[in-house]
Swiss-Prot record:
This is Dehydrogenase/reductase SDR family member 7C-A. The gene is dhrs7ca. Putative oxidoreductase. The keyword Signal applies. It is found in: Secreted. Its EC number is 1.1.-.-. Substrate binds at S178. NAD(+) binds at residues 41-65. The active site is at Y191. Belongs to the short-chain dehydrogenases/reductases (SDR) family.
Length: 324
């Protein structure tokens, strides 16, 4: 009996939905089986994204080493994970106090992390510090602090665990970076510079360690769209927030502004992408909506056009305030 043509589209939708559901279930099962018994180190685990990531890996049976700058928040996350899990299916997380802004003690912390289980299977570098201000208002000390947290801290930790991975000829680095590691915007000089630097380091590392069976994944995302995911306080800058909602006069920037607050990524989505990247050993993931994606291509293919548009946005007073 022939299927009426009017039923073809609904049937295709049902079939597609079923395949999509089965695919997601299979991938979720594979993700859990891949991370089970793996030693996973998460930096800044107390952030919104870090805690979501910790929950997913903990539920998957990973042996977690949770790092963060606040012991109280680490203990709170520890209690949350342990109270909502089956002890027979999960491992008790280990906690390590880690503050990349204090580089003097970083070598001791790296040793403590390595001694937790004697090995590291997955290192997730999630720590980040943000600052937005005109370059003339940023001190050199602030530049150094940003570089410590966003660059020197992660690479010091990576170098510390690398010998363990080389000895075992297995391991994975996951860098949770920012779109500004590929696309620099005004009023974010030191932040964008640190993100470009750490991106370059892990890109180079990927080629160097592949022969040892070690993989490197970088995840570049737009801003994290969640109230709990606030930037780490930096310093009091002379920039004063303006309550005005003036619209940029440049039509291109007016469109961009209308998308700035709607094109973020949630901590939950980002954490799920990290688990998938570990499962698939993805080399590079770009987690962004169309506007920043198009901007990235314009920057690569038509740099002159990109620079002109960005400069026009800075000259536009309303746009400059929103960029800040």
């Amino acid at each position: 009996m022939a299927v009426p043509s009017v039923m073809v589209l609904p049937l295709l939708i049902v079939v597609f939905a079923g395949v999509y559901y089965v695919y997601n279930e299979v991938m979720r099962f594979m993700s859990k089986s891949v991370v089970r018994n793996k030693v996973v180190v998460i930096t800044d685990a107390v952030s919104g994204m870090g805690s979501e990531c910790a929950r997913l890996f903990h539920a998957g049976g990973a042996r977690l080493v949770l790092c963060g700058p606040s012991w109280d928040k680490l203990e709170s996350l520890y209690d949350s994970l342990c109270s909502g899990s089956d002890p027979s299916q999960t491992f008790t997380p280990k906690l390590v106090l880690l503050d990349f802004s204090d580089m003097e003690n970083i070598s001791d912390v790296v040793s403590e992390i390595c001694e937790c289980y004697g090995c590291v299977d997955v290192l997730i570098c999630n720590s980040s510090m943000k600052v937005k201000a005109p370059v003339q208002n940023l001190s050199l000390e602030m530049d150094k602090t940003i570089m410590d947290v966003n660059y020197f801290g992660p690479i010091t930790l990576a170098k510390g665990v690398l010998p363990l991975m080389i000895t075992r000829r297995t391991g994975q680095f996951v860098l949770v970076n920012s779109i500004q590691g590929k696309l620099a915007l005004p009023f974010r000089t030191c932040y964008a510079a640190s993100k470009h630097a750490v991106q370059a380091f892990f890109d180079c590392l990927r080629a160097e360690v592949e022969e040892f069976g070690i993989s490197v994944s970088t995840i570049s995302h737009t801003f994290i769209n969640a109230g709990a995911e606030n930037a780490t306080p930096t310093e009091a800058t002379p920039i004063t927030a303006t309550p005005t909602k003036a619209t940029p006069t440049n039509p291109i920037w007016a469109y961009v502004c209308s998308k700035l607050n709607t094109h973020g990524v949630s901590p939950q989505i980002l954490a799920q992408e990290i688990v998938r990247s570990v499962n698939r050993q993805s080399r590079e993931v770009f987690l962004a909506h169309p506007v920043p994606t198009v901007a990235l291509y314009i920057r690569a293919l038509m740099p002159g056009c990109f620079f002109s548009v960005v400069s026009a946005g800075v000259r536009d007073g309303a746009m400059a305030e929103q960029l800040k």
